[in-house]
Amino acid sequence: MRTEYCGQLRLSHVGQQVTLCGWVNRRRDLGSLIFIDMRDREGIVQVFFDPDRADALKLASELRNEFCIQVTGTVRARDEKNINRDMATGEIEVLASSLTIINRADVLPLDSNHVNTEEARLKYRYLDLRRPEMAQRLKTRAKITSLVRRFMDDHGFLDIETPMLTKATPEGARDYLVPSRVHKGKFYALPQSPQLFKQLLMMSGFDRYYQIVKCFRDEDLRADRQPEFTQIDVETSFMTAPQVREVMEALVRHLWLEVKGVDLGDFPVMTFAEAERRYGSDKPDLRNPMELTDVADLLKSVEFAVFAGPANDPKGRVAALRVPGGASLTRKQIDEYGNFVKIYGAKGLAYIKVNERAKGLEGINSPVAKFLNAEIIEAILDRTAAQDGDMIFFGADNKKIVADGMGALLLKVGKDLGLTDESKWAPLWVIDFPMFEDDGEGGLTAMHHPFTSPKDMTAAELKAAPENAVANAYDMVINGYEVGGGSVRIHNGDMQQTVFGILGINEEEQREKFGFLLDALKYGTPPHAGLAFGLDRLTMLLTGTDNIRDVIAFPKTTAAACLMTEAPSFANPTALAELSIQVVKKAENN
């Protein structure tokens, strides 16, 4: 039906007869001439109808936005004065000789001249995806997956599919369950990741595996999360953690070079402890020049419990954040930041405004200055490298609250005051995570997943001091987003059972849930390691959007619903009966 795409026509096509298929993006009727902007997935070209082709001109008068049409015509060069430098096809136009209206369009529920609500865009997604910026994002996503496949093929990786209907295993979120009609009362789980299957593939001798795969997690959603998402999943045998990172870093550098024309250079490596200390986060945004500075040792003896308490508590922390030029912040802005950190459990936000350091106490403005002597204040200013015109914010509480609150404040202030250089790319690796974290109920939970190997520990050493264990894990972070994470896996049965035991999984439950894995570990398991990238998040970064739904063709809302198809929906009672499922209604509160 077509010979060319609208958006691919150039001066080299001048004089050629072409047939185009697409949609009316805009129509301008000048009486004796009608111009339309005709659009397809590759872009827009101007088509005009003149009186010499009366039948086509007459039919063109009926055109409206989003009519689906076919046009045959001749490509012509535009006059110099009519060239549109803002269009890729702006040097040419098509003189139409024939027009076919393939399908007409009703009045559109989306307005191309205004910003539509996200609810409307998701309900009429098939119209939203016609917009050039949305089409470009999905084209970029397709390019990324193509580049990934070629790179992985070139590096000896095999694309192997793993099951979608599998067994529920604890991986940190709730599973989506699928009832079995054949096995009454039993359920499959949709995979949160192919984690165990890819490890089993390593045990099967396929030493380099990858897969671009759908995963599912029934969890509370955030702006950058979806109940179903796509991973670039990777696993290797006989490779160390640095070797895995080297190959995966090369993949991401390749993507940025091909898609953005940017060489990311070598990625710096930072430990989890350093990232938390300097940035209050395990996914720091290195475009932001600000860092946290520990000052607890300077405040242990002050008669101000807000500072002295955490300063003398082994589980406490007092951190300072120097904001260059922050002395110009208004009282209202300071109060807003104080309320902001309360979201993370902080009780408030102390500060020192540095107006003129040379004047000592008279050169600062601070509600806590009366609790601090000149020597302590000077020591704080020295340690934070404060200069005239700066602001110093303080966080004082337990380590987690300080890290969470001050880390979030660092990011917010950096963005609000334009301190974060958004023209840059700042990738890094974060390594050496704690193996376990407190579950809040006196037990431990795996910080990554229970198949991650500890670093330089025997099973006996791990069992004796699990709280000291460092995971042989690594995350890739770009501009403050975790785009991928992985680890060296446990390849020894005793170690795996030790980890299960630390997590409170008894031997009976181990056999019930992971018997197949424990059996496989008995038969010459190779050392193996892997990683998974979030394809949606990578695409989000590479297309410059901050909304992950912009890079998924048919995404869910934050309530895990599809507004277009109205999924989820009630099931047919007959289908439920076949599955031996009865829906129990919750009793209404009186």
From Swiss-Prot:
In terms of InterPro entries, this protein maps to: Aa-tRNA-synt_II, aa-tRNA-synth_II, aa-tRNA-synth_II/BPL/LPL, Asp-tRNA-ligase_1, Asp-tRNA-ligase_1_N, Asp/Asn-tRNA-synth_IIb, AspRS_core, GAD-like_sf
Q: What PROSITE patterns has UniProt attached to this entry?
A: AA_TRNA_LIGASE_II
Identify the residues that bind L-aspartate.
Answer: 171, 217, 448, 489
The reaction(s) annotated as catalysed by this protein in its Swiss-Prot or TrEMBL entry are:
tRNA(Asp) + L-aspartate + ATP = L-aspartyl-tRNA(Asp) + AMP + diphosphate
Xref: SUPFAM superfamilies: Class II aaRS and biotin synthetases (SSF55681), GAD domain-like (SSF55261), Nucleic acid-binding proteins (SSF50249)
Q: Name one GO cellular component term.
A: cytoplasm
Q: Would the keyword Protein biosynthesis be found if you checked this record's keyword annotation? A: yes
Residues where ATP binds: 217-219, 226, 482, 534-537
Q: Where is this region: Aspartate?
A: 195-198
Pfam families for the chain: GAD (PF02938), tRNA-synt_2 (PF00152), tRNA_anti-codon (PF01336)
Which keywords label this protein?
Aminoacyl-tRNA synthetase, ATP-binding, Cytoplasm, Ligase, Nucleotide-binding, Protein biosynthesis
Its BP terms in the Gene Ontology are: aspartyl-tRNA aminoacylation
Q: For this protein, what is the EC number?
A: 6.1.1.12
Gene3D superfamilies registered for this protein in UniProt: Bira Bifunctional Protein, Domain 2, GAD-like domain, Nucleic acid-binding proteins
User: Quick one: where is this thing mainly located?
Assistant: cytoplasm
Q: Does the keyword Phosphoprotein apply?
A: no
Q: What is known about what this protein does?
A: Catalyzes the attachment of L-aspartate to tRNA(Asp) in a two-step reaction: L-aspartate is first activated by ATP to form Asp-AMP and then transferred to the acceptor end of tRNA(Asp).
Quaternary structure per UniProt?
Homodimer.
- Annotated family: Belongs to the class-II aminoacyl-tRNA synthetase family. Type 1 subfamily.
Q: What is this protein called?
A: Aspartate--tRNA ligase
Organism in which the protein naturally occurs: Shigella flexneri
Its gene?
A: aspS
